[in-house]
């Protein structure tokens, strides 16, 4: 059994209705902590009821309530729809309209699940907030550090890079040292009906995967057609709206050419999609903005060799980073990398420790 090493405490558990957070609630309850379950209603979940493998749908709220009832712990459902729309959905839509590839789960963790939920937990008199994320919090010489989960297949550190130092002190991640299989065994041991519940696979507010319909609903007439231009300067055809394209995309371009073409750049100002050969996707360096830094401060002229991830599914790559003012950094790969997409996160690691990260800008070369 994993023990948090804390004395008996009042702990709020963010309960999504899935097996991970349910196992956390059961684990902490068995250890004698005063556990309070909170489930956030984040969007109009009616469209997601009955959808398999979606997150935060009506069924999930019901499952969280059933787990809380079985454990005999208080459980609250909080309506965060307006906060979620403002902080996550609107940002998601606007990012696509700017020709970016957004990452709504990071925005949700940053603003709603951590910032707002920690505030609520404190108001309830809780000492800590626990979640079912597969990451580890390790107490270092200079305070709490964020580390990868021990199970590489389930590590979620990429999605939590915007967690602040203050938030990290308050948070607990009991599953960071477990595999998914071990978590399911724990849930079975506690007799939880969600022990075999499938993992969520989709963006929670787009359970059918059709993000374009969400964008068009919130921002009508957002699929304005425009030019497709080869990186060498000649026009190849017409696109159906920049929201339909992302960096590195090959399929669905609707262009006949003598070699495979990929989306290399998206220009939202002039409504142009640039395409080129695979070699045109190669990137040596880029700039990140809104940097959240969890380690010792980097000096202005200092260059630091690190590992970076530019997509959650890609392995870390060696790079050199340097500061550019208070909230920007330059990232330079030691070897070129393909398809660096504006709007995605660049997360910076030293071994298993998350040093920080930021959002990839258009300043790519």
From Swiss-Prot:
The active site is at residues 108, 204. The record marks 133, 344 as: Interaction with tRNA. InterPro entries: MnmA-like, MnmA-like_C, MnmA-like_central, MnmA-like_central_sf, Rossmann-like_a/b/a_fold. Disulfide bonds join 108-204. The keyword Cytoplasm applies. ATP binds at residues 14-21, 40, 132. It is found in: Cytoplasm. Keywords: ATP-binding, Cytoplasm, Disulfide bond, Nucleotide-binding, RNA-binding, Transferase, tRNA processing, tRNA-binding. It comes from the Bacteria. Its EC number is 2.8.1.13. This is tRNA-specific 2-thiouridylase MnmA. It comes from Rickettsia peacockii (strain Rustic).
């Amino acid at each position: 059994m994993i023990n948090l090493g804390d004395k008996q405490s009042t702990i709020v558990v963010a309960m999504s209705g899935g097996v991970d957070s349910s196992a956390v609630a059961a684990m902490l309850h068995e250890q004698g902590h005063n556990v309070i379950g909170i489930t956030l209603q984040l969007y109009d979940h009616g469209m997601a009821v009955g959808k398999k493998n979606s997150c935060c749908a009506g069924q999930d709220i019901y499952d969280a309530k059933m787990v809380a009832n079985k454990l005999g712990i208080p459980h609250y459902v909080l309506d965060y729809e307006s906060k979620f729309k403002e902080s996550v959905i609107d940002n998601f839509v606007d990012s696509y309209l700017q020709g970016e590839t957004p990452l709504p789960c990071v925005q949700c963790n940053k603003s709603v699940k951590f910032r707002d939920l920690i505030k609520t937990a404190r108001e309830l008199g809780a000492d800590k907030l626990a979640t079912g994320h597969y990451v580890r919090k390790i107490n270092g010489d200079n305070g709490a550090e964020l580390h990868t989960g021990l199970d590489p297949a389930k590590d979620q550190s990429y999605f939590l890079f915007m967690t602040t130092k203050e938030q990290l002190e308050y948070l607990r991640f009991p599953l960071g040292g477990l595999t998914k299989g071990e978590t399911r065994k724990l849930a079975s041991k506690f007799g939880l009906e969600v022990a075999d519940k499938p993992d969520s696979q989709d963006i929670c507010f787009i359970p059918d995967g059709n993000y374009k319909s969400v964008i068009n609903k919130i921002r009508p007439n957002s699929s304005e057609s425009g030019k497709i231009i080869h990186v060498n300067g000649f026009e190849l055809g017409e696109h159906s709206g920049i929201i339909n394209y992302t960096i590195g995309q090959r399929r669905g371009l609707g262009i006949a050419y003598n070699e495979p073409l990929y989306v290399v750049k998206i220009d939202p100002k002039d409504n142009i999609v640039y395409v080129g050969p695979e070699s045109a996707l190669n990137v040596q360096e880029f700039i990140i903005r809104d940097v959240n830094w969890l380690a010792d401060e980097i000096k202005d002229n200092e260059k630091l060799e690190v590992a970076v991830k530019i997509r959650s599914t890609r392995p870390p790559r060696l790079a050199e980073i340097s500061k550019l003012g208070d909230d920007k950094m330059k990232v330079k790969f030691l070897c070129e990398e393909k398809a660096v997409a504006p709007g995605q996160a660049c997360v910076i690691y030293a071994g298993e420790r998350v040093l920080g990260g930021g959002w990839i800008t258009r300043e790519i070369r």
